[in-house]
Amino acid sequence: MEDEEKAVEILGNTEAAHPPSPIRCCWLRLRCLAATSIICGCSCLGVMALVFAIKAEERHKAGRSEEAVRWGARARKLILASFAVWLAVLILGPLLLWLLSYAIAQAE
């Protein structure tokens, strides 16, 4: 009985000494998404997202997880903005051309 109590105490101490670090982002996936946003999205926002993703990965490797999460969040926002801008251009471009042709046809 004493052995079991000691084992439980030792396990409790090791868990308290090394709390599991929360994994909030896959850093490699974030970098790949940033590179994809350069190619498939608005490239200027994608480049900034890639820079922020690399900074987040470096901070994570250095053990500064709070800064890594902050830089990762910025990178994610820029990745989403890059894709949103590109989708808006893809949708609004043809729509505006259609409206322009309609307006010209009505003017004649």
Swiss-Prot record:
The keyword Transmembrane helix applies. It comes from the Eukaryota. It is found in: Membrane. Its main location: membrane. One of its GO terms (cellular component) is membrane. This is Transmembrane protein 265. It is a multi-pass membrane protein. Keywords: Membrane, Transmembrane, Transmembrane helix. Belongs to the CD225/Dispanin family. It holds the Pfam family CD225. The lineage of its organism: Eukaryota, Metazoa, Chordata, Craniata, Vertebrata. The chain crosses the membrane at residues 34-54, 78-98.
